[in-house]
Curated annotation (Swiss-Prot):
InterPro entries: IreB. It comes from Caldanaerobacter subterraneus subsp. tengcongensis (strain DSM 15242 / JCM 11007 / NBRC 100824 / MB4). Transmembrane segments: none annotated. Belongs to the UPF0297 family. This is UPF0297 protein TTE1249.
Length: 92
């Protein structure tokens, strides 16, 4: 979940209050799972297709089935690699 912070100055007490606002966005994991499932349903090798997309940036590696292509384009490719690496290393 992506969060942003909003800082407000309350004039009456002159105190700084920090609010955390959650945006309703799917996590990288949720998006990858949805894309993986869509690719599998269409008979593609999901790992090869996702790797092809990450290396080339060409969204045609990802099927439009179940809106998978639009979903994966919401994430920067470097963010995908970062999340995959973090996940892989945390399991070792």
């Amino acid at each position: 979940m992506i969060e942003s912070e909003v800082i407000a100055l309350v004039e009456k007490n002159e105190q700084t209050i920090k609010y955390t606002v959650s945006k309703d966005k799917k996590s990288v994991k949720e998006i990858l799972e949805a894309v993986y499932e869509a690719l599998s349903e269409k008979g593609y090798d999901p790992v090869n297709q996702i790797v092809g997309y990450i290396l080339s940036g060409d969204p045609t590696y990802i099927t439009s089935h179940k809106n998978a292509r639009n979903l994966i384009r919401k994430i920067e490719r470097d963010e995908l690699v970062e999340e995959l690496l973090k996940s892989y290393l945390s399991k070792e």
